A protein has these predicted regions:
Chain B
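Alpha-helical transmembrane segments of multi-pass membrane proteins predominantly involved
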Residues: 1-179
C-alpha cells in the first residue's frame, strides 16, 4: 500500500488487528464449520442443503481471514486445496449422474443404484448435497481471496 | 388472515432498510442497510414457511454478499460528499413509482398465504411430490427431494454456475490461482 503509515485513511485499511475479534473467531470457528456440515448433511431431513451449508463453511474461512488478515488465511487454505475441493465436488455430481446411466438408468436416476445398495437414493442425495457444498464453499472462499487481492495490475497486491 | 404484529414490524423494517440502501449517500452505510434488509427478508421467509429459502437468504444475502461488498468498498476510493442522502432523480422516481404501481395492481390477484385452493397447491406436480417424494427418494424434506432428485439436472446446472463464477473471476482478474 502506497501510504503505509499511521495516516492511513480508515476506508483504505482492509485489516485491523483486534484481540477481541481474533479470540472470538478462534472460539466460534469450530462451531460454525460444524453447523455448516450439519446443514449440508442434514439437508435431506431438515431445511438446508449443499448450497446453504457450503456458504456457511466458506464463511468460516472468510471469518478467519477477517480476524487474522487475508495473508495468513491464504497460507492456511492453499489454492490447490480450493481447486481440488471445487473440482472434486463438480466431478462427484457428474459421476453420480453418469453412474446411473452405466447401471442402465437415466442420467441422475438414483433408483438405478437401488440393486447395489438399499436406500441408495437417500445416500446419493446426501452425496450430491456434499458435492454441491464442496463447490460452493471453495468458490466462496476463492471469490473472497480473489476480491481481496484484486486485479493483477493493481497497486494493492498484498495488503495484509 | 391479518399478519402477525411481528410480521408488520419486520415488513416496516425491511421497507425502511430497502429505502435506506437506495438513498444513503455513504456506500458503507448503504451496504449495511442492504445487509439488514436481507436479514429481515430471511426472517420473513421463515414466517412464509420457507425455511430453506430463509437459510439461503441469511447465509448468502446477509452474510457472504455483505462481506464481498465490504471488500469491494475497501478496495475502492470514494469521496465523501458530506450529504447523508443521495439526490433523487425525477426520472428514476417515476420509473420506480410506475413499477410499484404495477406490482400493487397485480398483488390482489395473488392467492392468500396458505390458501388450500391456491394453484400451486392444487397443481398435479405439487401433489405428486408431496405424495411420493419420500417413497421414491427416501428423504423427508420434500424441498431437498425436488432439488436433488426430481430436478437434479437443474441443480447440476446451478452447481455448474457457481463453479463457473470462480473461473470467471480468474479470467476477469487475469490470474491463474484463486488465492
Amino acid at each position: 500500500m502506497s501510504d503505509a503509515g499511521q495516516s492511513r485513511p480508515p476506508e483504505g485499511a482492509a485489516y485491523v488487528e483486534s484481540t477481541i475479534i481474533m479470540t472470538t473467531v478462534r472460539l466460534i470457528a469450530p462451531f460454525v464449520i460444524t453447523y455448516g456440515l450439519f446443514v449440508m448433511f442434514h439437508g435431506a431431513d431438515s431445511p438446508g442443503g449443499g448450497f446453504q451449508g457450503g456458504v456457511i463453511v466458506g464463511a468460516m474461512v472468510v471469518m478467519v481471514g477477517f480476524a487474522f488478515g487475508v495473508a495468513p488465511a491464504r497460507e492456511w487454505v492453499k489454492n490447490d486445496v480450493l481447486v481440488a475441493v471445487a473440482t472434486t465436488g463438480a466431478l462427484t455430481f457428474v459421476a453420480v449422474g453418469l453412474g446411473a446411466q452405466l447401471l442402465g438408468g437415466r442420467f441422475l436416476e438414483y433408483a438405478s443404484y437401488e440393486p447395489l445398495y438399499h436406500h441408495a437414493s437417500k445416500y446419493l442425495i446426501e452425496l450430491v448435497e456434499l458435492a454441491i457444498g464442496a463447490i460452493v464453499a471453495a468458490v466462496v472462499v476463492g471469490l473472497y481471496f480473489s476480491l481481496a487481492r484484486g486485479h493483477v495490475g493493481s497497486t494493492e497486491e498484498d495488503e495484509a | 388472515m391479518s399478519p402477525a404484529p411481528l410480521e408488520v414490524v419486520l415488513l416496516v423494517f425491511v421497507l425502511a432498510c430497502a429505502v435506506g440502501a437506495a438513498l444513503l449517500e455513504d456506500v458503507l452505510a448503504a451496504i449495511l442497510a442492504f445487509a439488514a434488509y436481507s436479514l429481515g427478508i430471511s426472517v420473513l421467509w421463515v414466517f412464509l414457511q420457507a425455511p430453506d429459502v430463509g437459510l439461503t437468504e441469511a447465509a448468502v444475502g446477509a452474510g457472504i454478499m455483505t462481506i464481498l461488498f465490504l471488500l469491494a468498498v475497501a478496495k475502492t476510493a470514494r469521496e465523501p460528499s458530506g450529504r447523508t442522502l443521495e439526490s433523487v432523480r425525477w426520472r428514476s422516481l417515476v420509473l420506480v413509482g410506475a413499477f410499484v404501481g404495477v406490482l400493487a395492481l397485480v398483488l390482489p390477484a395473488v392467492p392468500a398465504i396458505g390458501d388450500p385452493a391456491a394453484p400451486v397447491l392444487s397443481y398435479d406436480v405439487t401433489q405428486y411430490y408431496l405424495a411420493n417424494s419420500y417413497e421414491e427418494t427416501g428423504v423427508t424434506n420434500a424441498v431437498t427431494a425436488v432439488l436433488a432428485a426430481y430436478r437434479g439436472l437443474d441443480t447440476l446446472g446451478e452447481a455448474t454456475v457457481v463453479f463457473t463464477a470462480a473461473v470467471a473471476v480468474l479470467v476477469v482478474f487475469d490470474r491463474e490461482v484463486l488465492t
